[in-house]
């Protein structure tokens, strides 16, 4: 069985850079830990892409799931045939998500 694909949109890549940088201001080790935990979470999500809730009020085909243990949510789309996911954004819960999609 092939591993599912995990694609990052340019905005998601930028989100990760900004989140990691923000965490690193206080604790560089914690920032590295965050990135590792995020990678593990994304693998789990790609293997189980339907576990997130649908978000039709934001965009067609969009789903979201909270990143457990953090105040962030992951917004993603399932690749046709459920062969993987495209991460659209990773956003803090305090953000006005409706304005960002």
Region roles according to the model:
Residues 67-101:
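Enriched for short, Lys/Arg-rich terminal
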Residues 1-62, 80:
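Basic, Lys/Arg-enriched alpha-helical interface segments
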């Amino acid at each position: 069985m092939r591993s599912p694909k995990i694609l990052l949109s340019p905005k998601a890549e930028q989100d990760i850079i900004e989140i990691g940088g923000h965490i690193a201001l206080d604790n560089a080790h914690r920032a590295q830990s965050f990135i590792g935990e995020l990678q593990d979470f994304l693998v789990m999500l790609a293997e189980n892409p339907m576990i997130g809730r649908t978000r039709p009020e934001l965009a067609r085909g969009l789903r979201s799931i909270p990143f457990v243990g953090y105040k962030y949510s992951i917004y993603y789309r399932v690749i046709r045939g459920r062969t993987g996911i495209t991460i659209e954004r990773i956003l803090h819960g305090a953000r006005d998500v409706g304005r960002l999609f």
